[in-house]
């Protein structure tokens, strides 16, 4: 956890310092909130079906892998058990084929991340299952197909929750035609973030919402080191044990914990829940970066209009002290209220009209 936190801070600092000037151009034109909501909403049905299918396949696979009671050839033949585990893993990999291809191409582009770690574990587990099926050996137990398959299923579940969160967020943005924005400003107070509410457009909100979450950011920095550590530890374990026939089983074991299930869904699930609850109040947050800015803010600007909205304020009466000129008092008071931008302006005007 400490290494992950350090990696996240270092990567965040590097991104802030070495941000590309043409980053906005690389993202392309920002879609409208309506189009973004339709796009992510359209992905939900497919992802929900694929996620459920993957989870259903994982249930018997986990049951077998835990060594729980089985019957028939599954109990008597290690070859059959290894082949069954392999077929179930390949089925889940086929259901989550985009996860596998993304992981592979990220490795080819030398930008490994969480999905690359899942891909590597799937490869080693599948090869290990093939070797165990061919040799018929039960000396090391069953392959780690359940871990690999469940990792792919968690990736699908994470994508499903992310799409749901974006659907709620962008639908709320599309409904409100004149929203108030709460933004994080780093120029109000030096070296710190200040949160303030204002009337401004929401340009850039969608692109900012779609930026990588904490797990992707952390593991983009950690993945190369985890891959290197897995190779070194796998080779050391094989050499020290002297059992070179089980090298694939060792590599499957050391790569299995590199992409923990919690990391795959650490942000997506709470983001979906928060986005749904915020949408019920007509609010939305710009993904992980919006939540991070609010969490790291140290100052908050609150105005009269935030505390005392116009619909909740009324003036009972005006009392002018003896010796004062009523016309001047009313004129000066009205000028001060209007100049201050206070929500008392409309209330004071209504009172003057009623008393005339």
Where do the language-model regions lie?
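Short beta-strand-to-loop capping motifs
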Residues: 1, 19, 320-322
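Signature of the cytosolic headpiece of P-type E1-E2 ATPases
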Residues: 58, 81, 134, 344-348, ...
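Structural motif at membrane-water interfaces of alpha-helical integral membrane proteins
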Residues: 12-220
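Hydrophobic alpha-helical transmembrane segments
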Residues: 89-99, 148-174, 186-303, 329-344, ...
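Residue-level detector of short coil/turn "hinge" positions at structural boundaries
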Residues: 10-12, 282
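Short amphipathic alpha-helices in soluble, non-transmembrane regions
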Residues: 2-7
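Conserved beta-strand/loop elements of the cytosolic catalytic core of P-type E1-E2 ATPases, chiefly
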Residues: 238, 308-328, 336-339, 356
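Glycine-rich, histidine-containing beta strand-loop boundary motifs that form or position
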Residues: 14, 266-267, 312
């Amino acid at each position: 956890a400490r290494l992950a936190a350090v990696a996240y801070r270092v990567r965040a600092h590097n991104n802030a310092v070495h941000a590309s000037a043409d980053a906005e151009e690389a993202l392309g034109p920002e879609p409208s909130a309506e189009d973004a909501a339709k796009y992510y909403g359209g992905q939900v049905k497919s992802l929900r079906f694929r996620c459920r299918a993957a989870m259903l396949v994982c249930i018997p696979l986990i049951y077998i892998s835990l060594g729980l009671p089985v019957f028939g050839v599954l109990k008597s033949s290690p070859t059959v058990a290894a082949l069954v585990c392999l077929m179930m893993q390949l089925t889940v990999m086929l259901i989550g084929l985009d996860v596998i291809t993304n992981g592979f191409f990220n490795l080819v582009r030398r930008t490994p991340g969480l999905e690359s770690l899942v891909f590597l574990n799937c490869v080693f587990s599948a090869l290990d299952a093939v070797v165990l099926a061919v040799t018929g050996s039960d000396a090391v137990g069953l392959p780690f197909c359940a871990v690999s398959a469940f990792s792919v299923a968690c990736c699908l579940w994470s994508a499903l929750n992310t799409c749901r969160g974006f659907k709620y967020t962008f639908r709320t943005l599309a409904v409100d035609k004149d929203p108030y924005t709460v933004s994080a400003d780093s120029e109000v107070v030096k070296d710190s973030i200040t949160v303030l509410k204002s009337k401004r457009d929401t340009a850039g909100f969608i692109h900012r919402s779609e930026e990588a979450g904490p797990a992707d950011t952390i593991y983009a920095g950690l993945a190369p080191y985890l891959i290197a550590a897995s190779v070194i530890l796998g080779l050391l374990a094989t050499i020290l044990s002297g059992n070179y026939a089980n090298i694939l089983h060792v590599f499957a074991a050391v790569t299995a914990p590199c992409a923990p299930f919690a990391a795959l869904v650490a942000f997506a699930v709470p983001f979906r829940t928060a986005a749904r609850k915020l949408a019920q109040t007509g609010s939305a947050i710009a993904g992980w970066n919006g939540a991070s800015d609010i969490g790291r803010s140290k100052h908050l600007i609150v105005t009269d209009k935030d505390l005392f909205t116009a619909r909740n304020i009324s003036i009972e009466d005006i009392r002018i002290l003896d010796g004062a000129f009523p016309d001047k008092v009313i004129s000066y008071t009205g000028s001060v209220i209007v100049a201050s931008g206070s929500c008392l302006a409309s209330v004071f005007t209504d009172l003057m009209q009623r008393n005339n």
